[in-house]
C-alpha cells in the first residue's frame, strides 16, 4: 500500500527528504534520516497502533520505557532526524524505533502497559536550553526561562541587591548556601558563579568549596590582570570555569593585557561584542583566541534599527550610573558601537562566537535566549544567503545545527556539564522541549524536566477539553511537590561534593559536579570553533576578519516577534 507524502506527513509527520519551515523565519531544514520502518509506524489514539497486542507489548516495567515520544523531528547539533525517543528513570534511554518486538521487526524501544506516550508527530524535539549568564534577581525568572525552552540556568546573584543587579555573582559561603537552599524546589537546573575578583586565592577557594561551580570576574568589582590570573590559577586547581566581564574603561590595562593574563588558559568571555561590557572598543578580538570560549548576550541579538537606542538607558540602570554625571554617560556611550554590534551578527554566522545567553534583567531578557538566537539566524539567512556547508543540500541544516549548538551543547561543554545536559543523547538527563513548527523558537508546546512534563501551553482548566482559550503557560505536575527535586539538579564543583554539602545544607535535589572543564578549548565548541584574525579600527570601530570587513544592515522587521505575542 502506498500513500502520498502529504498524507504520510499528516498522519506520522514529515520523513526523510521533507522540509520544515522554522516558525515564520526564512529557515528551512530537511530531514536527513528517519528511524521508522515504513508500514510499522506507531501512533497513539482510537483505532491507532499503540494498543494491547499491537504496538504495545505485554512486557513489565524493567523492559519497557516510562515514556515514548513518537515520530518527532529531532534538531540537535549532531543532526536533523526523525525518530522515537524513549525515556526511562528521567533519562534518555534510546533514540530509534519504538513498538512491540513480539509483533514488529527491529524494535529499539519497547512500549508496554507501563509506558506513557507523548505524540511527537509533526512536532520538533530539541534539548532544553542552557543559559550561562543569568543574574539571579528574582525567582520568577525561572518560569520565564522554563516556558521559553530553557532548562538550565548558570549565573549568580542573591535577589535584587545592587551587586546582583549589576554583576552575576553569588558571593561568599553564606549567600551560596542560602541560595542553594532557595532554589532546591525550583523546576530548573541551576549553577552558581562565585565572585572571582580577588588577587589572592583563599576567598575564592572558600566559595568553590561552598558550592560555586564557576568563578566570575566583573569590572564593577575589578577585572585587573592580577585578579584574572589569580582566578584562573584557582580554577586550574579545582577544575572549574572562569567567566569574565572585562575592563570597559581600560583602567588596569588594554585588551592585550587581559589576553596575556589568560596565559592560554580557557576562559568564558561574556558578551564578547562589548555592548554588555569589556574593553572598549576592541574586546571583540578575544573571539579569535583558541583558548577563549566566547558568548553573546541577547540584547544585541540581532542588530536592528532599535538596538542602539535601547541600550543606553538599560546600561545606566544596570550598572548604577548617574545620568547627571558626564563621566558616567561617557562610560555608557563607550560600550555601545553600531559597528561591533553589526559584526557580531556575522561572527555568529561564521561560527566565531560560540554561545548565546541572556544577561537576565541586567540588560538581557531570559525568556528570549531561544528566539533571539533564531532571529539572528534568520537575519543572516536573508542577508548572507545559504552557508557554504548548506549549498549542496539547498536547505539550512548546517546553519540550524550551528545556531542550536549556541544555547545547548556549547554552554554545557564550557561549564563542564555536557555529560548531563545540552543535547539529545542516550544517557543524558531528559530535559527536552517539544515545538509545533509554526511556533518553533518562540512558543514551545511541552517542556520536560528529568523526563516529566514541567510546563506546557495549557488551555482553560475548567474547559471540557485541554485546548480552549485562554491558552497560556502553566506549571505542570513535574514542577510541583517532591517531583521537582527528583527531576532537577544543582551543579557544583567536585570540591564542594567532597565536603558533604548536600547533607550539610539539607538539600533534596541531586548535586552534580562539573568536570573536564580546564581542558576545553575553542576547538571543542560544536560547529562554532572558527578563529579568524580579528582587528578593530580604534577610530571607526570597523571590524575585519582575515582582512574582510564585517558589516551588515540593521533589520527593520524580525520573525518570531509581534505576531506571536498579540494575546
Swiss-Prot record:
Residues noted as binding Ni(2+) 1 in the record, renumbered to the chain: 133, 135, 216, 359
Look up the record and name the cofactor or cofactors this protein needs: Ni cation
What's a single GO BP term from this record?
urea catabolic process
UniProt lists the family membership as follows: Belongs to the metallo-dependent hydrolases superfamily. Urease alpha subunit family.
What detail does the entry give on cofactor binding? Binds 2 nickel ions per subunit.
Which CDD domains does the UniProt record give? Answer: Urease_alpha
Catalytic activities: urea + 2 H2O + H(+) = hydrogencarbonate + 2 NH4(+)
Which Pfam family would be a valid example here?
A: Amidohydro_1
* Residues bearing the modification N6-carboxylysine: 216
> Which top-rank group of organisms is this from?
Bacteria
Record EC number: 3.5.1.5
Q: What is this protein called?
A: Urease subunit alpha
Q: In which pathway does it act?
A: Nitrogen metabolism; urea degradation; CO(2) and NH(3) from urea (urease route): step 1/1
Amino acid at each position: 500500500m502506498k500513500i502520498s507524502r502529504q498524507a504520510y506527513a499528516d498522519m506520522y509527520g514529515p520523513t526523510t527528504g521533507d522540509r520544515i519551515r522554522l516558525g515564520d523565519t526564512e529557515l528551512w531544514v530537511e530531514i536527513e534520516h528517519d528511524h521508522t520502518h515504513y508500514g510499522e509506524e506507531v501512533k497513539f489514539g482510537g483505532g491507532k497502533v499503540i494498543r494491547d497486542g499491537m504496538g504495545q507489548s505485554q512486557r513489565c516495567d524493567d523492559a519497557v520505557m516510562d515514556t515514548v515520544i513518537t515520530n518527532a523531528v529531532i534538531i540537535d547539533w549532531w543532526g536533523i532526524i526523525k525518530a522515537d525517543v524513549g525515556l526511562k528513570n528521567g533519562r534518555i534511554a534510546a533514540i530509534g524505533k519504538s513498538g512491540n518486538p513480539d509483533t514488529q521487526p527491529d524494535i529499539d524501544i519497547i512500549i508496554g502497559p507501563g509506558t506513557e506516550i507523548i505524540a511527537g508527530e509533526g512536532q520538533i524535539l530539541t534539548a532544553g536550553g542552557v543559559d550561562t549568564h543569568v543574574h539571579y534577581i528574582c525567582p520568577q525568572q525561572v518560569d520565564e526561562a522554563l516556558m521559553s525552552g530553557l532548562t538550565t540556568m548558570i549565573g549568580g546573584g542573591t535577589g535584587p541587591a545592587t551587586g546582583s543587579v549589576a554583576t552575576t555573582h553569588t558571593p561568599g559561603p553564606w549567600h551560596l548556601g542560602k541560595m542553594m537552599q532557595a532554589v532546591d524546589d525550583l523546576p530548573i537546573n541551576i549553577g552558581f558563579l562565585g565572585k572571582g575578583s580577588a588577587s589572592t586565592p583563599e576567598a575564592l577557594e572558600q566559595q568553590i568549596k561552598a558550592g560555586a561551580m564557576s568563578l566570575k570576574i566583573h569590572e564593577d568589582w575589578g577585572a585587573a590582570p592580577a585578579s584574572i590570573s589569580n582566578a584562573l590559577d584557582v580554577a586550574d586547581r579545582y577544575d572549574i570555569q572562569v567567566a569574565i566581564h572585562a575592563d570597559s574603561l581600560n583602567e588596569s590595562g588594554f585588551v592585550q593585557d587581559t589576553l596575556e593574563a589568560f596565559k592560554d588558559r580557557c576562559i568564558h568571555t561574556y558578551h564578547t561584542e562589548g555592548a554588555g561590557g569589556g574593553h572598549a572598543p576592541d574586546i571583540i578580538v578575544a573571539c579569535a583566541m583558541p583558548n577563549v570560549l566566547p558568548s553573546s548576550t541577547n540584547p544585541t541579538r540581532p542588530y536592528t534599527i532599535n538596538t542602539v537606542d535601547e541600550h543606553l538607558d538599560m546600561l545606566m540602570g544596570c550598572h548604577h550610573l548617574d545620568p547627571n554625571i558626564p563621566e558616567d554617560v561617557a562610560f555608557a556611550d563607550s560600550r555601545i558601537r553600531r559597528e561591533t554590534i553589526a559584526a557580531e551578527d556575522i561572527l555568529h554566522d561564521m561560527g566565531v562566537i560560540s554561545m548565546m545567553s541572556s544577561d537576565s534583567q541586567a540588560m538581557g531578557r531570559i525568556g528570549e535566549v531561544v528566539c533571539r538566537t533564531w532571529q539572528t539566524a534568520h537575519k543572516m539567512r536573508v542577508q548572507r544567503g545559504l552557508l557554504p556547508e548548506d549549498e549542496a543540500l539547498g536547505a539550512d541544516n548546517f546553519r540550524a545545527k550551528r545556531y542550536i549548538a549556541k544555547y545547548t551543547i556549547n554552554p554545557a561543554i564550557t561549564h563542564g556539564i555536557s555529560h548531563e545536559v545540552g543535547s539529545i543523547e542516550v544517557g543524558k538527563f531528559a530535559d527536552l522541549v517539544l515545538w509545533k513548527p509554526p511556533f518553533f523558537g518562540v512558543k514551545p508546546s511541552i517542556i520536560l524536566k528529568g523526563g516529566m512534563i514541567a510546563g506546557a501551553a495549557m488551555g482553560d482548566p475548567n474547559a471540557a477539553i485541554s485546548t480552549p482559550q485562554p491558552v497560556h503557560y502553566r506549571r505542570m505536575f513535574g514542577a510541583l511537590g517532591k517531583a521537582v527535586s527528583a527531576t532537577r539538579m544543582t551543579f557544583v564543583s567536585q570540591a564542594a561534593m567532597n565536603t558533604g554539602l548536600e547533607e550539610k545544607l539539607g538539600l533534596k535535589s541531586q548535586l552534580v559536579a562539573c568536570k573536564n572543564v580546564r581542558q576545553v578549548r575553542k576547538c571543542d565548541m560544536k560547529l562554532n570553533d572558527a578563529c579568524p584574525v580579528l582587528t578593530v579600527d580604534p577610530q571607526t570601530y570597523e571590524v575585519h576578519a582575515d582582512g574582510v570587513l564585517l558589516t551588515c544592515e540593521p533589520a527593520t522587521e524580525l520573525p518570531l516577534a509581534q505576531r506571536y505575542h498579540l494575546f
